UniProtKB/Swiss-Prot annotation:
<feature type="glycosylation site" description="N-linked (GlcNAc...) asparagine">
    <location>
        <position position="396"/>
    </location>
</feature>
<feature type="transmembrane region" description="Helical">
    <location>
        <begin position="317"/>
        <end position="337"/>
    </location>
</feature>
<feature type="glycosylation site" description="N-linked (GlcNAc...) asparagine">
    <location>
        <position position="392"/>
    </location>
</feature>
<comment type="similarity">
    <text>Belongs to the TMEM117 family.</text>
</comment>
<keyword id="KW-1003">Cell membrane</keyword>
<keyword id="KW-0472">Membrane</keyword>
<feature type="topological domain" description="Extracellular">
    <location>
        <begin position="153"/>
        <end position="176"/>
    </location>
</feature>
<feature type="topological domain" description="Cytoplasmic">
    <location>
        <begin position="198"/>
        <end position="219"/>
    </location>
</feature>
<dbReference type="GO" id="GO:0070059">
    <property type="term" value="P:intrinsic apoptotic signaling pathway in response to endoplasmic reticulum stress"/>
</dbReference>
<feature type="topological domain" description="Extracellular">
    <location>
        <begin position="241"/>
        <end position="260"/>
    </location>
</feature>
<feature type="topological domain" description="Extracellular">
    <location>
        <begin position="338"/>
        <end position="401"/>
    </location>
</feature>
<keyword id="KW-0325">Glycoprotein</keyword>
<feature type="glycosylation site" description="N-linked (GlcNAc...) asparagine">
    <location>
        <position position="374"/>
    </location>
</feature>
<feature type="transmembrane region" description="Helical">
    <location>
        <begin position="82"/>
        <end position="102"/>
    </location>
</feature>
<keyword id="KW-1133">Transmembrane helix</keyword>
<feature type="transmembrane region" description="Helical">
    <location>
        <begin position="132"/>
        <end position="152"/>
    </location>
</feature>
<dbReference type="GO" id="GO:0005886">
    <property type="term" value="C:plasma membrane"/>
</dbReference>
């Protein structure tokens, strides 16, 4: 009797394990199905355009600021003093880049990820360039503070201190970010499309499309044609304000801080889902090494000749398709995180804006006047009752909705 009970117990456990495996298998089948992956990748592109159009920060005339990345931008691009200090600044950020690359390659990638954590996705040299990129950002951030400490030696150098403020307006920065996210999202979506049409994990899906896609150079011609045409249109529309979303929308789907915060959160989740839906996630150990977008090769190899008397070898830059495309996703993720932060902690007065009747957000379009306004002056009550002496009209009449 006890033997029969033990047999039934083991049988029940085996059936339970098989049932769980069946559920997991079904979930993965639909979660990683080509239609699911295509839907997520193209929805990210659409949502990024939507949040750029709805985000009031994209109309702000105040100086753009961004944690960490803003310091790096200010350190390399803007706020250059004259004479010796300018040379010192260049030397420091060049040294920061070199230190960041070395630390990323040998400390973070090889020692931390490879030997200590033993992460399979970072085996050999896989993912080293992405690791080196993020370690370089960290290095630039640290060296920018070292540069600030040196500037404290002179009182006249205080205006040149490196901060998170980037020296450009939010309107200009958001346009550049929109173009950057478009490029990253499109290349990623096209990478997913390319992978779906090249692989055979789902042999019954899209047979006709796969047949046409694999003929000759169809995929390469289509990639560059669509990329150049759509990017030209996107850059034209974003940079010239030829199409204004507020004029098209006309309050049909008005948004507020909560809805924009949820939209930004969905974008972040979808960015991660694109990587998680990969058939080789999380180790990326499969034999399939997909072609780079717009190219007929799975990897880029660049030979760097060095002094053979010292190193006795040549160095090779090797970028595989997987890390090239998913590396782009993580770059876009930086901009999406900044967008998410703006929506979560949005305060109109910090961006030269205020709330008017009907919960509409008004933007002060003259950036020079923002220096003279404090928080109490950036309200509808004050701006609708005070006269601008330059125009002899109330301040709110010169502001954009």
């Amino acid at each position: 009797m006890s033997s029969q009970s033990l047999h039934d117990c083991l049988r029940g456990r085996c059936l339970g394990v098989l049932r769980r495996m069946e559920i997991i298998g079904r979930f993965r089948y639909y979660f990683q199905h080509p239609w699911s992956r295509l839907l997520v990748s193209y929805l990210v592109t659409f949502f990024n355009f939507l949040i750029f159009a709805e985000d009031p920060v994209s109309h702000s005339q105040k100086e753009a600021h961004m944690s960490v990345v803003g310091n790096c931008f200010s350190f390399i691009i803007s706020k250059y003093p004259a004479g010796f200090w300018s040379v010192l600044k260049v030397l420091l950020w060049v040294l920061a880049i070199i230190c960041g690359l070395i630390a990323g390659k040998f400390i973070f990638h090889r020692r931390l990820f490879g030997r200590v954590l033993r992460l399979k996705m970072f085996r050999e040299d896989h993912g080293s360039w992405m690791t080196m990129f993020f370690s370089t950002i960290l290095s630039l951030f640290i060296f920018s503070h070292i540069y600030n400490l040196l500037l404290l030696m002179s009182v006249r150098m205080r205006p040149y201190m490196v901060t998170e403020y980037m020296g450009i307006r939010n309107e200009s920065f958001m346009k550049m970010a929109a173009v950057g996210t478009w490029m990253g999202d499109f290349v990623t979506a096209w990478m997913v499309t390319d992978m779906m049409l090249q692989d055979t994990h789902y042999p019954d899906w899209g047979r006709t499309a796969r047949h046409l896609w694999r003929q000759g150079h169809n995929r390469i011609v289509l990639f560059w044609t669509v990329l150049i045409c759509l990017t030209s249109v996107v850059v034209l529309v974003i940079s010239t304000d030829w199409i204004r979303w507020d004029n098209l929308n006309r309050g049909f789907l008005p948004s507020d801080e909560v809805s924009r915060a949820f939209l930004a959160s969905f974008i972040l989740v979808f960015d991660l889902l694109i990587v998680m839906q990969d058939w080789e996630f999380p180790h990326f150990m499969g034999d399939l090494d997909m072609n780079l977008p717009g190219l007929s090769t799975t990897q880029l190899k660049i030979r760097l000749p060095v002094c053979k008397r010292i190193f006795k070898e040549e160095y090779h830059i090797h970028i595989t398709g997987k890390w090239f495309n998913y590396g782009i996703i993580f770059l876009v993720l930086i901009l999406d995180l900044n967008m998410w932060k703006n929506q979560i902690f949005y305060k109109p007065y910090e961006y030269g804006q205020y709330v008017g009747p009907g919960e509409k957000i008004y933007t002060v379009e003259d950036p020079d006047t923002l220096q003279d306004f404090n928080r109490s002056m950036l309200t509808w009550e004050w701006r609708s009752t005070n006269i601008d002496p330059r125009t002899n009209q109330t301040f709110n009449q010169s502001n954009a909705i």
